[in-house]
From Swiss-Prot:
Domain called PFL: residue spans: 35-770
Residue runs in coiled coils: none
Post-translational changes noted in the entry: Requires the activating protein CsdA to generate the key active site glycyl radical that is involved in catalysis. Phosphorylated on serine. Phosphorylation may trigger the formation of the active heterooctamers and thereby regulates enzyme activity.
InterPro entries named among the record's database cross-references: Gly_radical, GRE, PFL_dom
Protein name: 4-hydroxyphenylacetate decarboxylase glycyl radical subunit
Sites of Glycine radical modification: 873
Similarity comment: family membership: Belongs to the glycyl radical enzyme (GRE) family. HPAD subfamily.
Gene Ontology MF terms in the entry: 4-hydroxyphenylacetate decarboxylase activity
Native source organism of the sequence: Clostridium scatologenes
Reactions catalysed: 4-hydroxyphenylacetate + H(+) = 4-methylphenol + CO2; 3,4-dihydroxyphenylacetate + H(+) = 4-methylcatechol + CO2
Gene Ontology CC entries for this record: cytosol
Purpose of the protein: Glycyl radical subunit of the HPA decarboxylase that decarboxylates phenylacetates with a hydroxyl group in the p-position. Active toward 4-hydroxyphenylacetate and 3,4-dihydroxyphenylacetate, forming 4-methylphenol and 4-methylcatechol, respectively. Is likely involved in the catabolism of aromatic amino acids such as tyrosine fermentation. 4-methylphenol (p-cresol) formation provides metabolic toxicity, which allows an active suppression of other microbes and may provide growth advantages for the producers in highly competitive environments.
């Protein structure tokens, strides 16, 4: 063995790795998921996404029975009733229980949030036809046709939003439940008052052109991190006792707050009601398990039911006494919050750090083994994967792609600034490798203090092609926290508690003292409302298109923006006009969104979430009245960043710098799709397919010049300077506008799946992209097929600005499986991540998959029911993703070394 090998062997041994493994083509086999997991996953794969009216009925009934009650208490009673009356469903082999509804993949409508669609379509629904699209964004959004989606009606099932199936006998209940909300739902009240804003007509034009993807009221909660501290520390009976004490202390007392002081008593009364509802919900599961055990003849399943009876009976009243009870308690609270509102992105946070004290004691006492803990973690993944969001097709398909972004973060720093990695987090990764489900997605908060063996474990998981874990720069996240929340008192301790809310939204947190097993452990959790309910997904290439067409949308023939009537005789004139349209867009959309969210918080204030989030209970204020510790959390979401930047680069180079063409010639070529058929005609939504028309020769020179213009992602200063200038402009621009909390907006850069529908409504762009094809994905990913100088050149381009300026930055990369084979491949993958993090990059995620496999799966989806891919901050089953996004994922540049 030579000296070089000896040194490598020493290094590997110090990391607990055998030298022989470095040369193996494959690493150790991953154990199969537990039998209980496999049986329940077999059931999951057969299920359809089902909407029913049980929860909505009880909410509606209780709401109207309490007409005249104080609004906070009325709301809490209604939510509590919807939980406590839900039919408890327990499947054989389950060890963790509870779901959103009585159905495993269940969801339900929220007519008190949005009733107009159901009321307007009552006749169509009663006549047993597919519910039509609600708006323009719905009509151009595509939901995956496979898996559990119900894309069309059949038999006794009606399709709603091209995703949810509802039994025909439920439709009359839906119609009757929706009727009382006519004119007074959050949606309709918002519309009423939004019409009073001076820019309302402009707002409608923007929404109808799909420049903005959807309204805030559609998913008013989520994109935040839940906090499990209260029930883990006190238990439900303990919380009820605390509520009684607080009611006695503050009822009738305003303190020194003349605005909200008197409302503290009503807040605690509401918290008592919702806690009673959560307790009753758990009690119902305990009773159901007891009954099932009494009739079960299989001894193993009977023992499961008896254990469920014990666990659910205990957590219905007492704080958790062991790991099993603690993880079940977190599920109860999680389902409680996601049932309050239509929402996505209620993230789990740093669960492995929250539950570490319970795990540690059980292992030390011999109560559970690591394998038994892994089984519960595998089953936990199924529970989270079953969470569905009842929303329109535009939200379900065009934004979420069927995922609900329940992100679980790993690593980072603890309260004292040391590595926060716990032994339980190794098992969480292991469970994600064994039971490969879309949720919860995993995110590593990469820190220089993170143990090397944990990073290697996480990289081994990423290699499997599951799309998780993704990798975040912990230091950049902390810097953003201090920058954005410093004015609200954020200190270094709280900055260390941050993690991801939703797919990629940096969310503030705090540490709280959990007393358990004779110790006090500072556990992290969320400390803010939603971090993603602002200006939702502005298609920046579309705005640029309308600059070139004088505000006229040539696709629809509508005058979207006021004509600027300017001669675009310089690059600066064009960009300044884009800025004017962008600021007009932000102004009118933000005003209307503020009204929507203000109406929501006045009538639909969170109940469960306002119990859990610090410092609501301490202040006696719900989330809507800024009870949470941090409230500067409302964002401006962008889409198509790199398509936009590359378009600017092309126009600047070809029109203004080199004078190859006039701006009129460039615009004409774009309006004529460079002489090619559009994606509307070909039904191919990625740039790798072009079908010529008889006009193609007319535009071939200009098309070639557009394709060959400098592109972002190649460490090319020409394009990168445009990219950098954009970021400093958008930072200043977003901070000019205020949220309904009176705090500045900030930039959120996640495409999610909106680059599909927003690309669909956008004509050809100056970078050579054709009409109707998807925008570039992410925000710092190179546009597919344009990165010519390798991954490290993309890293150079991506880090020309400070990533802590914004809430996030999204980097998607696709690797061929052969590029990361064996232990050496794992090391290469980790080195790639580390290189980007050290340059200041915020986020990177990987698809490790062969494009040939994806193409075959697109043609024969029935053969690939379990295939998952990374889309944009989340993983989803391939067959449940719409074709435009499938095409985009296939066409992403694939690196094989």
């Amino acid at each position: 063995m030579n000296v070089k090998e000896t040194k490598l062997e020493d290094v590997l041994k110090s990391r607990g790795i055998d030298m022989k493994d470095a040369y193996n083509i494959s690493e150790a086999d991953i154990p199969e998921a537990k039998e209980s997991t496999q049986k329940l996953m077999d059931i999951y794969y057969t299920l359809k996404v089902t909407a029913d009216m049980e929860a909505a009925y009880w909410y509606n009934r209780t709401w109207w029975e309490n007409d005249g009650e104080v609004i906070e208490v009325r709301r809490a009673k209604a939510v509590a009733a919807s939980l406590s009356h839900m039919t408890p469903t327990i499947l054989p082999y389950e060890k963790l229980v509870m779901n959103k509804t009585k159905n495993v993949r269940g969801a339900f409508p929220f007519p008190w949030v949005c009733a107009s669609f159901f009321n307007a379509q009552a006749e169509a629904l009663m006549n047993e036809v597919d519910a039509p699209a609600e708006n323009e964004a719905d009509s151009v959004s595509v939901v995956g046709a496979g898996g559990g989606n119900v894309t069309e009606s059949y038999g006794n099932v009606i399709s709603i939003a091209k995703k949810f199936g509802m039994r025909k006998e439920e439709i009359p209940v839906l119609v009757k439940t929706s009727k009382p909300w006519e004119g007074i739902s959050v949606e309709e009240l918002s519309n009423k008052y939004s019409k009073m804003t001076p820019g309302y007509d402009q707002f409608k034009n923007i929404m109808e052109s799909v420049i903005c993807m959807f309204d805030s009221f559609a998913i008013p909660q989520g994109r935040e991190v839940i906090n499990y501290y209260m029930p883990l520390q006190y238990g439900f009976d303990g919380i009820i006792k605390l509520c009684d004490e607080k009611i006695a202390e503050v009822m009738g007392e305003a303190g020194d707050d003349g605005d909200f002081g008197m409302s503290r008593g009503y807040y605690y009364a509401a918290m008592k009601e919702i806690t009673k509802g959560l307790s009753a919900w758990c009690e119902n599961y305990s009773k159901r398990a007891k009954y099932l055990a009494s009739i079960e003849t299989d001894s193993e399943i009977k023992a499961n039911y008896e254990k469920i009876e014990e666990v659910m009976g205990n957590i219905a009243h007492k704080k958790p006494a062991n790991f099993w009870e603690a993880i079940q308690m977190t599920l109860c609270c999680h389902f409680g919050v996601v049932n309050e509102d239509p929402q996505s992105g209620l993230s789990i946070g740093r669960l492995g750090q929250v539950l570490q004290p319970f795990y540690e004691k059980d292992v030390e006492d011999g109560i559970m083994t690591d394998e038994e803990v892994i089984e519960l973690l595998e089953l936990y993944r199924i529970k989270i994967t079953c969470i569905e969001c009842f929303a329109s097709a535009g939200v379900s398909g065009g934004v979420l792609s069927g995922n609900t972004f329940n992100n679980l973060s790993l690593g980072g720093q603890n309260y004292d600034g040391l590595s926060a990695v716990t032994p339980l987090e190794y098992l969480i990764v292991e469970a994600g490798m064994r039971n490969q489900t879309p949720q919860p997605t995993l995110s590593v908060l990469y820190d220089e203090k993170t143990p090397e063996d944990f990073l290697m474990k996480a990289a081994s998981c990423t290699k499997l092609g599951l799309g998780y874990p993704a990798w975040m720069n912990n230091q950049t996240g902390m810097n953003f926290m201090m920058r954005n929340y410093g004015p609200e008192g954020m200190d270094l301790h709280d900055a260390r508690a941050w993690c991801l809310g939703g797919c990629l939204e940096s969310a503030p947190g705090c540490f709280l003292p959990l007393e358990y097993n004779g110790k006090v452990t500072m556990i992290p959790g969320g400390a803010s409302p939603t971090c993603g309910t602002g200006v939702h997904f502005i298609g920046m290439p579309k705005v640029l298109e309308l600059v070139l067409t004088n505000g006229l949308d040539k696709r629809t023939g509508k005058q979207v923006y006021p004509p600027h009537n300017k001669k675009l005789d310089s690059y600066e004139t064009m960009v300044n006009q884009w800025k004017e349209y962008m600021e007009l867009t932000t102004d009118v959309v933000n005003r209307c969104n503020n009204i929507q969210m203000d109406i929501w918080r006045k009538y639909n204030m969170p109940a469960v979430n306002s119990l859990l989030k610090p410092d609501c209970f301490k202040k006696g204020k719900h989330i809507g009245t800024m009870g949470a510790r941090y409230n500067s959390c409302i964002n401006f979401e962008s889409c198509g960043t790199i398509t936009f930047v590359n378009s600017l680069s092309s126009i600047k180079k070809n029109v203004f710098d080199d004078s190859k063409f006039t701006i009129e010639e460039m615009t004409d070529a774009m309006l004529n799709n460079f002489g090619f058929k559009t994606a509307y005609e070909t039904e191919v939504f990625s740039p790798d397919f072009r079908e010529s028309t008889d006009k193609s020769t007319k535009y071939e020179k200009i098309f070639a010049a557009c394709v060959n213009a400098p592109k972002y992602g190649n460490a090319d200063k020409y394009a990168d300077e445009i990219f950098k200038a954009y970021h400093y402009y958008i930072y200043d621009m977003t901070h000019k506008f205020r949220s309904y909390y009176g705090k500045p907006l900030y930039l959120c850069q996640i495409s999610v799946s909106t680059h599909g529908p927003q690309g669909f409504v956008t004509l050809a762009t100056a970078d050579g992209r054709l009409a109707g094809t998807t925008y570039s994905d992410g925000s710092v990913s190179a546009a597919a097929g344009t990165d010519k100088n390798g991954i490290y050149a993309i890293f150079e381009s991506a880090t020309v600005y400070d990533h802590s300026m914004h809430q996030n930055a999204q980097m998607n990369l696709k690797l061929h499986p052969t590029a990361v084979k064996g232990i050496n491949g794992t090391r290469k993958l980790l080195d790639l991540v580390r290189a980007y993090m050290r340059k200041g990059g915020f986020h990177v995620q990987f698809n490790v998959v062969d494009s040939k496999t994806l193409r075959d799966a697109q043609l024969t989806p029935e053969k690939y029911r379990e295939l998952m891919v990374r889309v944009a901050g989340f993983t989803q089953y391939w067959c449940e993703i719409g074709k435009p996004i499938q095409d985009e994922v296939i066409y992403r540049t694939e690196y094989d070394k």
